[in-house]
Amino acid sequence: MKWLAILQLVLLSFGQGALARELSTCFGTTADGRLENGWRLPLSGENFQTYSRVASLAGRTYVHSTVHRVILEAYAKTREARQDTIFVYGETGLRTGGEFKPHKTHRNGLSVDFMVPVRNEESHSVTLPTHLGNRLGYDLEFSDRGQLDNLRIDFEAMAAIAKFEVVPQPIAQMSR
């Protein structure tokens, strides 16, 4: 019984440290800046996923801690309103910011690429196809009507996520 109490204390202490992540600070601009204590976005959640597990694990999905919170809160609120919609986020930046090819921005943790949510011909929400053949989704071109092969842009889902208010701290408090 004594070993169980010790194990609980160890796990509790470890958990406290894992939760006590340092907040981020951004410097400069999105085009000429850097980031301290960048936070990596999760690979996936109930209604979202990264554009590429490999690129994410290679360190291309770090953001400012406030941006991290805002994105996850927006996905959570959207999940409540649109349970069947899947979202895909793209590139964001490096853990310490700085140059981020091929982008001219994404340098201080405040830039995020969001891929459009799409539906197939049965009107089911599906993930945007991202692979090397289409430069991980960045080379996809939809028609003026939002069509690409058997996919159509889910404009209703885009409008739904735009309705939610997530109030971040002022940028002045985020950067130096």
Residues covered by each model-derived region:
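Charged, often glycine-rich, active-site loop that binds/positions anionic groups
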Residues: 95-109
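Sec/Tat signal peptide C-region and signal peptidase I cleavage site
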Residues: 16-20
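Bacterial N-terminal signal peptides
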Residues: 5-13
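Mid-length scaffold segments of soluble, non-membrane domains
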Residues: 105-142, 149, 153, 157
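Short, compositionally biased strand/turn segments
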Residues: 6-7, 87-91, 95
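Positively charged n-region of N-terminal signal peptides that target proteins for export
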Residues: 1-3
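Active-site acidic/histidine clusters and adjacent loop/turn architecture
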Residues: 22-89, 150-175
